[in-house]
Amino acid sequence: YYLLNKFDSTIIASNKILALEKADENVSEKASYYLAKSLLKNGNSGQAIEEFKKLTNAKNTEYASEAQYTLAEIQYNNIQLDEAEKIILEITSNPSSEFWLAKTFILWADIFKERGNKIQAKQTLQSIIDNYEGDQSIIDEAQNKLNEINNKQSQEQKLQEQKLQEQKEAVDEIIIENK
């Protein structure tokens, strides 16, 4: 159901599986995973957060890693940068998936940028571009975000140069008038 974007049906099916006493642990983790993702897609972030928290202890390290990343991302999206960074530090101290670790560093770069630390954001993104050897989409995402920061800095620099030029011209005009 989830892959068909039928999130309500996914929630119902996942809850039925989780209610079974004899459900296999792998099946239960998969049900919890899709339950959490569906709750989030449906805008029920409170319940989704609770499900993702449970998943951080999953034996399936991909589910656990994605759950931790998603918790950090939710905090970031809610402008809870300190909370997001706490989760990021937990992830980086005990990484279990290179993919989700790289995604975590990209999110961390977003936090640096949000806090005005563009140099650290750029260095973090460049490190991913230079060193990550996994999924190309991660490298592309890091490159796009780095380009975005560089383009914005370039625009800001051009505006600053334009203002300085206007000020210089105004001063020159005053000097010429006073001669």
Where are these regions (language model features)?
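Acidic, polar-rich low-complexity tracts and alpha-helical solenoid repeat scaffolds
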Residues: 1-179
